[in-house]
Amino acid sequence: MCSSAAASPALDDIEEGIALRPKFDAAGLVTCVTTDAGSGDVLMVAHMNAEALEKTIQSGEAWYYSRSRKRLWKKGESSGHVQRVLEMRIDCDQDAVWIRVDQAGGAACHTGRKSCFYRRIDRDASGEPLLTMVDAERQFDPDKVYGK
């Protein structure tokens, strides 16, 4: 892997080459979209630094970088709901990663839901945005799992 601090490779090499050369942002992160390998549903969007990306590739389990906690974390380290990576892809610019996972425990979201995307943006009668719960059934009680 190549860090963003290294010399910039040619655009053609980034878009068409076979070398992994992730383009980390100023904070040293790439966006990661995680989907359920079976259903194709989006489970979550998170971030990876170089270490999280490397650990994910090497271990076959999803690792992320928490911007709020400012630390590396393995998905499922507290809940047991690990994500086994079945496929990883990187986009054309190599600045975003997509991983397809087998989600243990049936829930990816820290709220106990299958997906972090459990609210749809609709409009009320006056045209104002309104959030509607969809696919919002909890798979686990976050208070019991995380002790909040």
Swiss-Prot record:
Pathway: Amino-acid biosynthesis; L-histidine biosynthesis; L-histidine from 5-phospho-alpha-D-ribose 1-diphosphate: step 3/9. It is an enzyme of class 3 (hydrolase). Keywords: Amino-acid biosynthesis, Cytoplasm, Histidine biosynthesis, Hydrolase, Magnesium, Metal-binding, Zinc. Its main location: cytoplasm. Binds 1 Mg(2+) ion per subunit. Its cofactor is Mg(2+); Zn(2+). GO terms for molecular function: magnesium ion binding; phosphoribosyl-AMP cyclohydrolase activity; zinc ion binding. Coiled coil: none annotated. The keyword Repeat does not apply. It is found in: Cytoplasm. Pfam families: PRA-CH. It catalyses: 1-(5-phospho-beta-D-ribosyl)-5'-AMP + H2O = 1-(5-phospho-beta-D-ribosyl)-5-[(5-phospho-beta-D-ribosylamino)methylideneamino]imidazole-4-carboxamide. Its EC number is 3.5.4.19. Disulfide bonds: none annotated. Zn(2+) binds at residues 92, 109, 116. Belongs to the PRA-CH family. Homodimer. Catalyzes the hydrolysis of the adenine ring of phosphoribosyl-AMP. This is Phosphoribosyl-AMP cyclohydrolase. It comes from Rhodopseudomonas palustris (strain HaA2). The lineage of its organism: Bacteria, Pseudomonadati, Pseudomonadota, Alphaproteobacteria, Hyphomicrobiales.
